[in-house]
Amino acid sequence: MAESKEAIWQRAGGFGVDIPFVTLLGFELTQFEGGQSEIVFAPKPEHLNSFSVTHGGALMTLLDVSMATAARSQLPEMGVVTIEMKTSFMQPAIPGSGPLVAKGVLMHRTATMAFTQSTVFDGAGRACAHATGTFKYLKRLPSGAKSTHSLNTASGQVSTD
């Protein structure tokens, strides 16, 4: 029996932190385990560019978040920050063919770094965009020259800090 979306969300602590931009876009985490993640995104008219296809910035955010969650699936108590990301746009993500699905994979990790990749597929299963990314595992985010602050915890979630 497949794991329920609620169980995945609970195990991942949602996305683990409150990310208002991800909430605004409406991403839905559907897989979070074993170095893999899957996020579903149904673009709305406000997510399109002047050619009436999904905006590249929305696709890059989807790729970034799917790679980050793939990295975090191995260490869900840690946060990650993007160090580097390279994106290739292969074909337009045309609305109406169904939701987009990003499949992130953790290819390698060290104690502090994660090396990932992700592909966004359209509703017909065609690859629209692909990215590779490097992420740093963090317990806290730096703020200022010599200070740190905690990650924004998701609503109803208990911080591990």
Please state what every model-predicted region is:
Residues 1-161:
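Terminal targeting signals and extreme-terminal segments of soluble enzymes
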